[in-house]
Amino acid sequence: MKFDDRVYQFDAVPPLSSEDLKSPFARFYQVPVMAPAPAILAAIGPEQLDISNVLAFSKIEWLFRPESTALKNGWCILPDGTGYSLITTDMPGVAVEEEQWWPQWIMDPDFGYLNYRIWMPGLHVSHGTPIVEDLGWGASEVQMFQPLFPQLLGLSAEPKTLDPAYVGMIGSSGRSNLQGHPEQMDYTVLINCVKQTETGLRVQSVCYMGVKWQDGQLVKVHDVDPAKQRLFATHNAYEFQRKAQLLPELYAFSASMPNHGLNPNVRLPIKL
């Protein structure tokens, strides 16, 4: 775990191996992780979000409307014992083509999934099957077993009709367990909605923890430990801030490389 009361312990990340250092992207691993905006740091503090500010899954269409800017950031445990968080990250200077480039770049298995490790040094391990990362409570195996698309969410219209600023969505119903403990599963439904702004892009990431997707609905699987929900929100906030921090420079750096630095053997399971 590399978070200490919302502070990313960058000085504790493991060094790169001599093989890792052969990657043209190795220098980006050394770039210190930038903290989220002060308002987001406040939102992932110990105080839980008021239930009245939760985006219920039955109202998920709000995420795809212009009014989504009014959604409140934060985390909480819902009355039924499941968890919730929503994190908004502005990504100034990030273009749509850079956002579309990113998923294939992080999935490259070369140099021991170094690209994925660059994203969150010391927390991200590999992007295979399963994905291995530390969500804040130890190295976990993450499985995304049900991709989610706008067509599955019961929206009243196409996302681009609901909001012309809409760029794309990546969502899934998944589960994770601490390595070596497959009996301790945490279920999560995660939806990341990306839109254009005047200065770049904005991503809003909503998490429903303790549930799984089934027949168009969220079905409760287990209660959620408040500490875990808060740590998940913290991890989420740092992930997207780190992406906003690195992406423009990474994309420009790779421009002179064959295939813009992407591994042609990597195929995306979900396309933005």
Language model feature labels by segment:
Residues 1-32, 255-272:
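Sequence termini and other peripheral, non-core segments
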Residues 118-185:
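Glycine-rich portal/gate segments that line the openings of hydrophobic small-molecule binding cavities
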Residues 45, 210-214, 218-270:
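A conserved amphipathic terminal alpha-helix motif
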Residues 2, 8, 12-14, 20, ...:
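Hydrophobic ligand-binding cavity/cleft-lining segments
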Residues 3-18, 175-234:
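Beta-strand/loop substructures that line and gate deep hydrophobic ligand-binding cavities in soluble
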Residues 105, 150-154, 241, 245, ...:
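A generic structural signal for well-ordered alpha-helical segments enriched in polar/charged residues
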Residues 114-115, 200-202, 258:
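Residue-level detector of alpha-helical recognition elements and their boundaries
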